[in-house]
Curated annotation (Swiss-Prot):
GO terms for molecular function: glycine binding; glycine dehydrogenase (decarboxylating) activity; pyridoxal phosphate binding. The lineage of its organism: Bacteria, Bacillati, Bacillota, Bacilli, Bacillales. PANTHER family: GLYCINE DEHYDROGENASE (DECARBOXYLATING), MITOCHONDRIAL, GLYCINE DEHYDROGENASE, DECARBOXYLATING. It catalyses: N(6)-[(R)-lipoyl]-L-lysyl-[glycine-cleavage complex H protein] + glycine + H(+) = N(6)-[(R)-S(8)-aminomethyldihydrolipoyl]-L-lysyl-[glycine-cleavage complex H protein] + CO2. This is Probable glycine dehydrogenase (decarboxylating) subunit 2. InterPro entries: GcvPB, GDC-P_C, GDC-P_N, GDC_P, PyrdxlP-dep_Trfase, PyrdxlP-dep_Trfase_major, PyrdxlP-dep_Trfase_small. Its cofactor is pyridoxal 5'-phosphate. Keywords: Oxidoreductase, Pyridoxal phosphate. The keyword tRNA processing does not apply. SUPFAM superfamilies: PLP-dependent transferases. The glycine cleavage system catalyzes the degradation of glycine. The P protein binds the alpha-amino group of glycine through its pyridoxal phosphate cofactor; CO(2) is released and the remaining methylamine moiety is then transferred to the lipoamide cofactor of the H protein. The glycine cleavage system is composed of four proteins: P, T, L and H. In this organism, the P 'protein' is a heterodimer of two subunits. It is an enzyme of class 1 (oxidoreductase).
Length: 488
């Protein structure tokens, strides 16, 4: 018997079943052939599901129960900052003065929105130690690309057209080399040393007259603070390059350290991560970019400026790289981030990072006896473990991740960064209680013991989810992305 919770909505369909009633036609009925040219008409009716309203509700309610989000459970996805998104953000984003305006309205009619954008630009500049910020980029990767295009424009304006290479660490997010390529640069890899930090000697080897920039996350993707950042900045600047800050891990340093004070020239932030815009499920995101003074002329236009007591969009930017997104950024996400910043205040933001770092270190130390700890030092907001010892028992990191589903948890990031064997990257964020952390830790300890005593339990997981382990290789190579009715 078919499990109705697993059935496609097409499989619930019965001919003639109606899910909605339409009002009586109040215009003259005409054959569709007289209204639409024949070449645009289907020869057969589309195979749309015919279900009742109740069936429809039950079907999608059942599907929603199979989803996992921050509001439903712990989500320790490393390098993603899956923190709780305060619901006051949603209330403010729904204010009619924000939700019902149009980007083509006269500036005089949207002064509240322009003020919010201006004050958000100012706040982000202060938080990061930059001189000016654009809110246009739609997400982190576009922020990276925008920042690199600003660096390209700066070098070209100075006649420095031979700077074709961008340096990225071997532990970097994949978007870093991808953004460099899309921006027209060649990416060059710098190694990580035995302490999990950028190898300074190797950095000196790869830096040269063709270096446009070094892209860096600090703390890095291993969750470790690049303690030699000032020296690294000097190496890049002496070579004539720029230092780019990937803000993916900003949740570790709010109110404690600023990229601009470390020597960074360009910064992007992920407002949908650090500043509680909801994310997961495809967006939207927001990836503002901040720059130091010498790069301001190249920022995307327009930028919101303040004239006396009013605000306007400044298009008079002759050296701008132009727009990077239609209109003025993902405004709704920016409203949420602004609300979060105003709610927390400077001290609150600092506390966010202190708790994020505390939670990560607590989890790391409690789990270290059961999993390999590649870098045995204090971490920042996230940390990496290795499943090397479990691999020797026939249990892979993928198996551990699948087994966690049985406990109701979203797994951590796995097999990234690539320079850690059988990697698990865990980021608890500041919003989780000690009780939640302890429950997750106990689940991980149980899985470690199962790997030793009953490895098949882990190897065959998950056992309690609606759908068991999938053939992910076949799904990736031979995807079936649409429903097709098979007739005998």
């Amino acid at each position: 018997m078919m499990n109705k919770d697993q059935a496609l909505i097409f499989e619930l369909s019965k001919p003639g079943r109606v899910g909605h009633s339409l009002p009586e036609l109040d215009v003259l009925e005409q054959p569709v052939e007289t209204l639409i040219p024949a070449e645009f008409l289907r020869e057969e009716a589309p195979e749309l599901p015919e279900v009742s309203e109740l069936q429809l509700m039950r079907h999608y309610t059942a599907l929603s129960k199979r989803n996992h989000g921050v509001d439903s459970g712990f989500y320790p996805l490393g390098s993603c900052t899956m923190k709780y998104n305060p619901k006051i953000n949603e209330d403010v984003a729904r204010y009619p003065g924000f939700a019902n305006i149009h980007p083509y309205q006269p500036e005089a009619q949207v002064q509240g929105a322009l003020r919010l954008m201006y004050e958000l630009q100012t706040a982000l500049a202060e938080i990061t130690g930059m001189d000016e910020v654009t809110l246009q980029p739609a997400a982190g990767a576009q922020g990276e690309w925008t920042g690199l295009m600003l660096i390209r424009a700066y070098h070209e304006a100075n006649g420095d057209t031979n700077r074709t290479k961008v340096i990225v660490p071997d532990s970097a997010h994949g978007t870093n080399p991808a953004s460099a390529t899309v921006a027209g640069f060649e990416s060059v890899t710098v190694r990580t040393d035995e302490d999990g930090l950028v190898d300074l000697d190797h950095l000196r080897e790869v830096v040269g007259e063709d270096t446009a920039a070094l892209m860096l996350t600090n703390p890095n993707t291993l969750g470790l603070f690049e303690a030699h950042i000032v020296e690294m900045a000097a190496i890049i600047h002496e070579a004539g390059g720029k230092l780019y800050y990937d803000g993916a891990n900003s949740n570790a340093i709010l109110g404690i350290a600023r990229p601009g004070d470390m020597g960074f020239d360009v910064v992007h932030l992920n407002l949908h991560k650090t500043f509680t815009g909801p994310h997961g499920g495809g967006g939207p995101g927001s990836g503002p970019v901040g720059v130091k003074k010498e790069l301001i002329p190249y920022l995307p236009k327009p930028v919101v400026v303040k004239d006396g007591d009013s605000y306007r969009l400044d298009y008079d930017r002759p050296h701008s790289i132009g727009r990077v997104k239609p209109y003025y950024g993902n405004f709704g996400i920016n409203v949420r981030a602004y609300t979060y910043i105003r709610t927390m205040g400077p001290e609150g933001l600092r506390t966010v990072s202190e708790y994020a770092v505390l939670n990560a270190n607590y989890m790391m130390r409690r789990l270290a006896p059961y999993f390999d700890l590649p870098y045995d030092q204090h971490c920042k907001h996230e940390f990496v473990l290795s499943g090397r010892q479990q691999k020797k028992l026939g249990v892979r990191t993928l198996d551990i991740a699948k087994r966690l589903l049985d406990f109701g948890y979203h797994p951590p990031t796995i097999y990234f960064p690539l320079n850690v064997e059988e990697c698990l990257m865990i980021e608890p964020t500041e919003t989780e209680s000690k009780e939640t952390l302890d429950e997750f830790i106990e689940a991980m300890i149980q899985i470690a013991k199962e790997a030793e005593e009953t490895p098949e339990v882990v190897q065959e997981a998950p056992h309690h989810t609606v759908i068991g382990r999938l053939d992910e290789t076949t799904a990736a190579r031979k995807p079936i992305l649409r429903y097709e009715k098979i007739t005998q």
